[in-house]
Amino acid sequence: AGGAAGGAVVDSAALDAFAAKVTGADGVLASTAKFVLNQLGVVAPVAEETADENTAVVAAVEAELGADWPKQVEPRFDERKAILFDDRWASAREDLARAYYNNDESALNGSFIGLGKTIADEAAWYAGKSDNANLKIAFNRVAAEAGENASESAENSRFAGDIAVVTGVAPNSIAAQVVNGLLAGGATVVATSHSFKPSVKAWAKQTYREHAAGDAKLWLVPANLSSYRDVDALVAWVGNVQKKTSGATTTILKPAYEPSLFFPFAAPPVHGNLADSGELFESQARLMLWGVERAIAGLAKIGADTDVQHKLHVVLPGSPNRGIFGGDGAYGEVKSAFDAIVNRARAEKVWSSRVTFAHPKIGWVRGTGLMGGNDPLVEVVERHGLKTYSAAEIAVELLNLSTRES
């Protein structure tokens, strides 16, 4: 009986839980106080991140990814800087006049195929006026080309209706040669450039002038595809209509495109051996591999709700070089990983149901950023039976893997 007089024992855990409900950070008293402050228009102060915390984050980024990592992934894409080349008929008239008045046959080296009756008639007129026999022949050739129906030519319409995205273009590169072939086949091409230098813009203008056939168009846009933000921005820009509204007038600057071809050629200078693995290899793989995967998934998703049968054909630029040269950074690992991309497409239908692949193993290409340093050895290796390619030659092979028939 005496023991019973001592009263019940209180469970300390239950007491702590009760106290938390009343006086804890999310308890009744705190919630009531926040409600009253909000009703009075008073915002409770938020603790600012301390300088020490910011310093720790910066130090961690520098240690793991390198001091220049923020610059490496800084977005460059800007839809306002996109340049469209689609006025071949206008530059064709300039070429005709330049050839005639300067007596310059080379001004007619560009493409005039399918430009229509106006250009054909103008070329014929110059042919009748010219006293230069060779120039007269050239004008007549232009008149015949302009009068052709590009859609009736297998060569000049092989990519008609295709929307091709080509990343990493630079003059004299494989990507540039691929763009040339796509334009010659009548495609609409979206080409990305990291540098967006005047020399790249001049190349784009000239390559359109020399190669565009039929209704071919060329967009040149700046993009840093080491930046996932830029990858996403590029995908969104490609897949959405771009408009400009002035008062009551709305102008379509770019229609929404549904890409059918993707050539991921964006790549950094690759260097470094296994001992350099870390931030250097990670930055290279980010651009050549992970950004490519993200772009494939994003581009393939465009139009999925409205065109369920559409396919994105991806030409992955593979390589037999899986580390056999050495000193080329993450290049070998990335090219090995391309095998995995193709393999996982068979298992991951959530994205691959709208994607097809060509995965050629590109061999020795002369004059490129990767192999150009070995050009003095070309004569010797070819003498021993090893075939090398120019950028234009390998582009032909890649484009042959990109037609509807392939």
Segments from the language model and where they lie:
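Rossmann-fold scaffold of SDR-type NAD(P)-dependent oxidoreductases
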Residues: 167, 222, 246-269, 316
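Catalytic loop of short-chain dehydrogenase/reductase
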Residues: 155, 266-381
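Flexible cofactor-recognition loop at the NAD(P)H-binding site
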Residues: 42, 171-172, 195, 261-272, ...
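Glycine-rich phosphate-binding loop and adjoining beta1-alpha1-beta2 segment
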Residues: 195-213
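Rossmann-fold cofactor-recognition segment
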Residues: 208-229, 233-236
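Canonical Rossmann dinucleotide-binding motif of NAD(H)/NADP(H)-dependent dehydrogenases/reductases
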Residues: 150-192, 196
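Short, hydrophobic alpha-helical segments
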Residues: 239-242, 303, 398-405
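C-terminal helical subdomain
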Residues: 1-9, 14-24, 28-49, 53-106, ...
